[in-house]
Amino acid sequence: MKEGLPDLREIPSCIGGDPKSRRGIVVAKSIPAKKYGVTTGEPVSMALRKCPELICVPGDFALFETCSRAFKKICASYAPVMESFSIDEVFLDMSGTEKIYPDPVKLAHEIKDRIREELGFTVNIGIGTNKLLAKMASDFEKPDKVHTLFPAEIPTKMWPLPVRDLLFLGKASEQKLIKAGIKTIGEMARYPETEIQRLLGEKTGHQLYEYANGRDDSPVRGEREEAKGYSAETTTEEDIVTYEQAFSLLLAQCDVVAARMRKDGKKCSCVSVTYRMLDFRTRSHQKKLGNPTDVTEEIFVQVKNLLYECWQCQPLRLIGVALTDLTSDDFRQMSLFENTENHEKQKKVDGVVDDIRKRFGNGMIVRGSTMKTADKVARKAKAQMELRDKNS
């Protein structure tokens, strides 16, 4: 809320796109806008047809990041383990704090009220015995609410909801379920799992069937686990909507992180890709490698394959790569199917590039396909390294 402007939370409003050209998509919407049928992810032009008086303002990503850090700092002060789920969502694992905080509902109200009083915005808090139930509970009635969703409450609170409200269930899956006569989460939970898998695929069907029954054994992963490696990510001014755009950034990032890793004499056995969509949901996809590597080209090939597997060109504003499971071992398991000649050739290329950059600077040699992105990626990576060195 800015001085002289109405409170966007109390009027039909949305964040996203250019209000003058009416281009772009809705990143977030107010509760009054939701009553007009405005939905996150739809074109601004469509939202304006639903609600002609809709106030549309461009996103201030610097402000969002500042608010996010402040919000997460407060949350982290209460929990031994915190996992970021998106720019404005976290999971808190309160295991072992029962003597300090015996009443989880009372604690949730304390956290919620503190965020409102200190930061000026409201949050919903969901309480459950696993991440799924806590997330589902947080999406109940808004704003500024605390909700519980314990196993005994699933039949009354979760099962009556439409299947589209189930976490990670997309529009395509919703249409398949409705066509099969499955309209609520409860109907899905009572349906034979084999039939759900037949409709949605074996892996996806199993996961969503488990979710429909309130089961989720994924742990809350602390932020420290993510620091044992090399990573780079880039927030863009324009939406990333094609593989060509994404690969240009990812190749520049692979160049930077692989060079840092080689400088430290390390190799990685795991490569992951992370991206953030316009609704601020973040997704990650990773792959374990058969052999540890520090070769830029080999890493980039895996990154490309990962992105093909997990991304269908939804608009993005942030994308990144991470190299983990590090080793200093030079041993490499030989394979009959491996092109060892190409591996050695690429290692030599990386060595020459590293040497030139060390002697003359990073800007002296740049891949042609990354000329528009390499400088920005390198500058941000350097700033991240300096900040890490300062804090270590």
What positions do the PLM features span?
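Short, hydrophobic beta-strand segments
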Residues: 90-96, 284-287, 333-339
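Short, charged/polar surface micro-motifs in flexible loops or helix N-caps
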Residues: 19-22, 278-281, 326-329
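Short small-residue beta-strand/loop micro-motif enriched in glycine and branched aliphatics
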Residues: 56, 281-285, 330-332
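DNA-contacting surface of Y-family translesion DNA polymerases
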Residues: 165, 173-316, 388
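Gly/Gly-Pro- and Ser/Thr-rich, intrinsically disordered tail segments characteristic of DNA damage-repair
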Residues: 1-213, 259, 343-392
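C-terminal hydrophobic structural anchor segments
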Residues: 294, 304-358
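A glycine-rich phosphate-binding loop feature that marks nucleotide/adenosyl-phosphate handling sites
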Residues: 129-132, 212-213, 267-278, 316-327, ...
